[in-house]
Amino acid sequence: GNLIIVVNDNDMSIAENHGGLYGNLKLLRETNGQAECNLFKAMGLNYIYVDHGNAVGDLIEAFQSVKDSRKPVVVHINTLKGKGYAPAEQNKEVWHYNGPFHIETGEPLYEMTEEDYSDISMNYLLDKMKKDPAVVAITSGTPTVMGFTEDKRKEAGKQFVDVGIAEETAVALASGIATNGGKPVYGVYSTFVQRTYDQIAQDLCINNSPATIVTFCGSVYGMNDVTHLGLYDIPMMANIPNLVYLAPTTKEEYLAMLDWSIEQNEYPVGIRLPGGSVISDGKEITKDFGDLNKYEVTQKGSKVAVIGLGTFYGLGKEVAEELKKVTGTDATVINPYYITGIDAELLEELKKDHDVVITLEDGILDGGFGEKIARFYGDSDMKVLNFGLKKEFLDRYDVAEVLKENHVTKEQIVEDIMKFI
């Protein structure tokens, strides 16, 4: 049939290319498509090469020549990433994704001076690598998710591995490294976790390989277009046996969890980074995360218990303050740390002097953290209210509007609590 496959070859992924496929593309570019070794012809496909892929006239000519083809055909076009804008041509990796900028100079309109989890991760891992050659950072085509710009990748050397845009391969590689005594850390955007599900379950967790997966932008405050949403990783990762999925609320908690995860050899571990601005309170973290599923009561009260997971722990504290102001009730506030398990002892203890437990999570409710708490109390008189997002696809959304529509503002939450106290 008339199947036309367009290969837009700009000699780049997001960063530089990795993998055997690109070697053949390079050979074809260098020979103007004439190399005898041709992956596409080996598959039985017809093939034509367009050397000036940014030239509209050449493209029209190429497509006219194949539009009536009776066999599947590959149109391999050699293009320049960032073509037509000098700053983008000169720094292709940085310009793959960019914020608002001055078109005359390419300089950003807004200087980002705040610390972020990408740089925090990179600085920690580079220091760890220098002390321990077993530590390996892994990315799947998005090296700057962990802060590894080109210069930092060179500094890390062989202890940094980019498998290309192949998240499945990254997890399988991490499992293999961990099984053989290495200490792999795979950084991935939450939105791409669905690509890894089979490997997390089959390669990583069945083998109980002690690798670390750090998920970035898993939050309503993360990327906000429909194909890049970080709202669904909790139901995916929190329900795979053997996996320990953690939710830090601060920089200090994250680094403590990361250090524990790298050094332990009992569990595959995921760490879901908070959304929004980095919170750093300078608090020394002495918790043993190997003592699984032990939550922390950060404020002791009665009647109402607020369990705020990850990003929404801060919202939980605000809810407790608002509840005190409106009703005079001192609520208990809990940092659960663990997404994958419940602290049955603590939850049982709450029955003695609490009537309502609320859960807050930065993601969809269906299959999420709050439902685990609700299930625990299912045969008791405890009222459980789960707050989070409904199951839907969002696109180019306003965070404040989404939170309000889902009844996840401190005022709305307190209104709901007041119905039961």
Would you name each region that the model predicts?
Residues 2-94, 110-124, 128-155, 162, ...:
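Thiamine diphosphate
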Residues 1, 160, 169-177, 182-187, ...:
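Extended, hydrophobic alpha-helical segments in both membrane/secreted and soluble proteins
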Residues 100-102, 238-283:
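Helix-enriched interaction subdomains in cytosolic or periplasmic regions
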